[in-house]
Amino acid sequence: MLSAKSLFQEILDNDESFRLFCSIAASGEAQGGWENGRIAALVPESERDLAPKVARHGADEDKHGRIFNALLKKRGLEPVEVPHETDYTMLLEKHGIGLAHEQLKRDQPLTVQDIVTYLAHSRVTEQRASEQMELLRKHFSDHPDIGRAVRMISSDEDNHLAYCHEELLRFARAGHGRTIQRILRESALAEIRIYRDVSLAVMDHMGRILGWPRAKAALLAAGIHAVYVYERLGGWRRMVSLKMPERRNALGGPATSAPEFA
């Protein structure tokens, strides 16, 4: 039976597919870490209290990148170049979701509008990350090789999502509510399309590595398209709702270390 668990187990059991999976994940996390590090450095003076939380957000993502690279090293594997069509983070930036890298490379302070854009973009992408890690935690939290990494990253992603909810609600109370809802909607509708395209590309690469028969590849592609249809018809709304999280001030302290993955 084809299931999320059996699919990931197949990827996990093969060195080349595991190598590609970890390389894609590490690259995306490292890119997110750089983006958040730059945002933290450029936070406007009126929002300087937010800078340590943005920095913590970036530090967590840097840590996740190191964890995925450490998982490769543990199996004696080297990272591979990430195929362009599988680079989720880069494709989001290319399609104008979040803050442009050219803007972040400059030393010009961001505006409050920029910070709202960053938080709204993160609200959408962290929803996806939290859901994906929850799925892995459900099936692989006790796995001897990746279980600890899965639990740690999953907890961090839940913290990131809680942080986005709390800060966006703060900005909404300050009068930015309509702007937040507009950016959330635009980001969510773009994200579900990019997620579909990246998922199809990743499965195509995995299928060639693992020698999947055409029927299996077609079934997986049909499943990805079905998820997109569901999300386009209304599933995207889960990515734009805001509620006060149970985890308050989720990024209020320093990033947790992962010395065992150093």
Predicted segments, located by residue:
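Non-heme di-metal
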Residues: 1-262
